[in-house]
Amino acid sequence: WNYGSSAAEVMQPLVQYIDVIFGAEPEYKEILGIQPVGFKAVDAADTTFEANFPAFEEFGRRVVELVPRCQKAFLELRNSITSNHNLLAAVLYSDSTLKHTGIYDIECEVDRVGAGDAFVGGMIYGLIMYPDNDQKALEYALAASALKNTVYGDFNHVTVEEVESLMQGNTSGRVSR
């Protein structure tokens, strides 16, 4: 960011007009000044994620206090175990309720560049396609991001069918044609 003002100085006045906010831990800290709960899961079965749900809910309440117009606060979570082994999860605070995904354990990450964009694109798609199902929209966003980690380059070249297959638990990695 190199525009003569800090990201916080530019974004804080604008954020008051949003209905939906999304980001990872650094964005929430930089723009709103609040530190989300750390995500330190070490594998997909790690229960520390569930143990932190009350803190994630408090985080969501704090976002809504700071941005009263905001109806949905998405938080994408990543714990980098090694340079190519990452754990992903996400939470959504909406209607005074916390929703969460499971944990994706990506052991052979190809390229993480663009994974945040894939999450946001998946979130927008999910909100449009599942307008009355925030849980499904959240799961779609994270599945799109998880799959992007397996694709080289900045763009997510996976299909809707591949994202939905992952959402349904198909993690076999088998090629389907």
Each predicted region: which residue ranges?
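Conserved post-catalytic alpha-helical subdomain immediately downstream of the catalytic base
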Residues: 83, 103-170
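Alpha-helix boundary/capping residues
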Residues: 18, 35, 144, 170-171
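Conserved phosphate/ATP/ADP-binding segment of small-molecule kinases
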Residues: 1-97
